[in-house]
Swiss-Prot record:
The keyword Transcription does not apply. This is Cytochrome c-type biogenesis ccda-like chloroplastic protein. Residues 158-176, 228-259, 307-321 are stromal. One of its GO terms (cellular component) is plastid thylakoid membrane. GO terms for biological process: cytochrome b6f complex assembly. Keywords: Chloroplast, Cytochrome c-type biogenesis, Electron transport, Membrane, Plastid, Thylakoid, Transmembrane, Transmembrane helix, Transport. The lineage of its organism: Eukaryota, Viridiplantae, Streptophyta, Embryophyta, Tracheophyta. Required for the transfer of reducing equivalents from stroma to thylakoid lumen. Involved in the biogenesis of the plastid cytochrome b6f complex by probably transferring reducing equivalents from stromal m-type thioredoxin (Trx-m) to the lumenal thioredoxin HCF164. The gene is CCDA. Its main location: plastid. It comes from Arabidopsis thaliana. It comes from the Eukaryota. Belongs to the DsbD family. It holds the Pfam family DsbD_TM. It is a multi-pass membrane protein. Residues 1-134, 198-206, 281-285, 343-354 are lumenal, thylakoid.
């Protein structure tokens, strides 16, 4: 038994469990209050490893999100009912895939809550008011607790934990607010783009949605590791955080939030799809940006709360074990959604029967 083990054993037991554990250097240390430095090192190491592991997933998810928006904003108003059914089908797939880790009762509850939130948003969109904004904000809160969002949560918290290491609670909260503002900005811009794209729908034609569906299928097969897809060198070499390394930490967090919003936007279904569909129909950039900003404020509120509790961040980082499922789940959703929309463009009567 080496010296580090002997010293650790002299500390006895804490809470009925041995106070000894291996640190990242494979040395035995006490797990008491004198090991805060070891915890910080472990937290940063976990965050860095997770970021490297999911780098390709983020970039592919960014492209996938853009394709999803392209499909949404080019839907005609006559297909509003079809859009709702497609969205609900995709949402059902997400929850079925995630229920295994959360339990049937919790999964069913969250799925039901998201359905009710989506219905409440649809009711409010018929006559906008201050109450409508409150309902949309609440829908953002509910959506942030969905199983799909939980699968992306370790990635988000890993980044927050990385830029929060060694800082005071106030600094961590400030950076998290900047990160959340980046998320909100991206989704608000999606609303504005959707409104302008809705105006130009008559000039777009059917070629873009078909091409977008085909690319979604290819990307889904790549995430499932069925085919190999080489990203352009720009995506392989460009790192937005490295490009912003000379900026203050709050600016870096804001720029990172802009990127993470695209990776997390598929998890906002069906509420986000409902809002984007409405904005594309209303064709009002001000309303579009306001609705998406309100929704995103509710969506990111739990992140700000989580950043207020350092212990919560460390415990939530243990959810990184589910990150191995992000690629296959995203690939299955991309493949299924791409096939459905592709067939819908070519054989609309057949997809109506489905």
């Amino acid at each position: 038994m080496n010296l580090s083990v002997n010293r650790c054993i002299t500390g006895g037991f804490v809470g009925g469990f041995s106070s000894c554990r291996l640190n990242h250097e494979k040395r035995w240390v006490r797990a008491g209050k004198h090991c805060e430095l070891e915890r910080e090192r472990s937290l940063v190491s976990d965050a860095v490893s997770l970021e490297r592991l999911e780098s390709k997933s983020i970039k592919l998810a960014m492209l996938a999100s853009g394709l999803g928006v392209a499909n949404l904003v080019t839907l005609s108003s006559a297909k509003a009912a079809d859009l709702k059914m497609i969205v609900l089908d995709q949402a059902t797939s997400i929850y079925i895939l995630a229920e295994g880790s959360l339990g049937d009762s919790v999964g069913n509850f969250l799925y039901s809550a998201n359905q009710q939130a989506n219905e409440a948003v649809q009711d409010q969109l018929s006559a906008l008011s201050v109450t409508s904004l409150a309902v949309i904000f609440g829908a953002g809160l509910v959506t942030s607790l969905s199983p799909c969002t939980l699968s992306v949560l370790p990635l988000t918290l890993g980044y927050i934990g990385a830029f929060g290491s060694g800082k005071s609670r106030g600094q961590v909260i400030g950076d998290t607010v900047a990160f959340a503002l980046g998320l909100a900005t991206t989704l608000a811009l999606l609303g504005i783009v959707a409104s302008f794209a809705g105006k130009a729908y008559g000039q777009i034609g059917q070629g873009l949605p078909v091409a977008a569906s085909g690319l979604a299928i290819v990307m889904g097969l790549n995430l499932l590791e069925i085919i190999e897809l080489q990203l352009p060198s720009f995506f392989n070499n460009f790192d937005p955080r490295a490009a912003a390394a000379n900026f203050p930490s709050s600016v870096q967090a804001y720029l990172a939030g802009l990127t993470f919003a695209l990776a997390a936007s598929p998890c906002s279904t069906p509420v986000l799809a409902t809002l984007l569909g409405y904005v594309a129909t209303s064709r009002d950039p001000v309303i579009g940006g306001s609705l998406l900003l309100t929704y995103t404020t509710g969506y990111v509120a739990p992140l700000i709360v989580a950043a207020s509790f350092a212990g919560a961040l460390q415990s939530l980082l243990s959810l990184r074990k589910v990150s191995a499922w992000i690629n296959p789940i995203s690939g299955a959703l991309l493949l299924g959604g791409g096939l459905y929309t592709f067939l819908d463009r070519l054989f609309p009567a057949a997809t109506m029967v489905m």
